[in-house]
Amino acid sequence: MAPLGGAPRLVLLFSGKRKSGKDFVTEALQSRLGADVCAVLRLSGPLKEQYAQEHGLNFQRLLDTSTYKEAFRKDMIRWGEEKRQADPGFFCRKIVEGISQPIWLVSDTRRVSDIQWFREAYGAVTQTVRVVALEQSRQQRGWVFTPGVDDAESECGLDNFGDFDWVIENHGVEQRLEEQLENLIEFIRSRL
């Protein structure tokens, strides 16, 4: 049962800690595959849009990496959890509306319920990708541990998930990352 989007050939659900490089990896894949073939979907997009509307905030500023977003992050996490508890598929359904590309990269999968929703909706074409980075690498990218954020379910919900289909190591070694991206791209192309 494919809700409201097209029927994708492949759905890759990316997860990882803040500053692990999830967006970097998904954007690199999209730039190599082409935006006509590959859509990057962000579960946080509809969350931030709805949160901004309900709280009278600037939606565009919530999308960037500014201190503006950070000022609201804890409350946004709390608010998003309340929405998900009421309807676990709420944000998942929103991001697939009208998507026509055959390859979907969900750049910010954070919970087991997100994975379950996509597996139920799209079955065998759904795979999980964990992006990992050493704490030192994340710190070099600007990460600082924030209580109430880095220890919340939105950051830790998939820590013990177990068997990811793919693990991308993004420790700052460009050649190693490139090899992993090439392997993933080869797999993606085999699904087209």
Curated annotation (Swiss-Prot):
UniProt effect for mutating K48M: Approximately 1400-fold decrease in Vmax for MgATP and R-MVP. Approximately 3-fold increase in KM for MgATP and R-MVP
Chief location of this protein within or outside the cell = cytoplasm
Q: Which UniProt keyword terms apply here?
A: ATP-binding, Cholesterol biosynthesis, Cholesterol metabolism, Cytoplasm, Disease variant, Kinase, Lipid biosynthesis, Lipid metabolism, Nucleotide-binding, Steroid biosynthesis, Steroid metabolism, Sterol biosynthesis, Sterol metabolism, Transferase
Record's note on what induces expression? By sterol.
Which reactions does this protein catalyse?
Answer: (R)-5-phosphomevalonate + ATP = (R)-5-diphosphomevalonate + ADP
One Pfam family, short name:
P-mevalo_kinase
> Known consequence of changing R110M?
Approximately 20000-fold decrease in Vmax for MgATP
Single GO MF annotation: phosphomevalonate kinase activity
Q: Which InterPro entries match?
A: P-loop_NTPase, Pmev_kin_anim
Positions that bind ATP: K17, R18, K19, S20, G21, K22, D23, R141, H171, R176, Q180
What does the record list as GO biological process?
cholesterol biosynthetic process; isopentenyl diphosphate biosynthetic process, mevalonate pathway; response to cholesterol; sterol biosynthetic process
The EC class name is transferase
Gene Ontology terms, cellular component aspect? cytosol; extracellular exosome; membrane; peroxisome
Q: In which tissues is it expressed?
A: Heart, liver, skeletal muscle, kidney, and pancreas. Lower level in brain, placenta and lung.
Q: Which pathway does the database say it acts in?
A: Isoprenoid biosynthesis; isopentenyl diphosphate biosynthesis via mevalonate pathway; isopentenyl diphosphate from (R)-mevalonate: step 2/3
Tell where it localizes: Cytoplasm, Cytosol
Q: What is the effect of changing K19M?
A: Approximately 9-fold decrease in Vmax for MgATP and R-MVP. Approximately 10-fold increase in KM for MgATP and R-MVP
The EC designation for this entry is 2.7.4.2
Q: Which residues bind substrate?
A: N170
- Function according to Swiss-Prot or TrEMBL: Catalyzes the reversible ATP-dependent phosphorylation of mevalonate 5-phosphate to produce mevalonate diphosphate and ADP, a key step in the mevalonic acid mediated biosynthesis of isopentenyl diphosphate and other polyisoprenoid metabolites.
* Assembly description: Monomer.
What disease is linked with this protein in Swiss-Prot or TrEMBL? Porokeratosis 1, multiple types: A form of porokeratosis, a disorder of faulty keratinization characterized by one or more atrophic patches surrounded by a distinctive hyperkeratotic ridgelike border called the cornoid lamella. The keratotic lesions can progress to overt cutaneous neoplasms, typically squamous cell carcinomas. Multiple clinical variants of porokeratosis are recognized, including porokeratosis of Mibelli, linear porokeratosis, disseminated superficial actinic porokeratosis, palmoplantar porokeratosis, and punctate porokeratosis.
Instruction: Report what the protein is called.
Output: Phosphomevalonate kinase
Protein species of origin: Homo sapiens (Human)
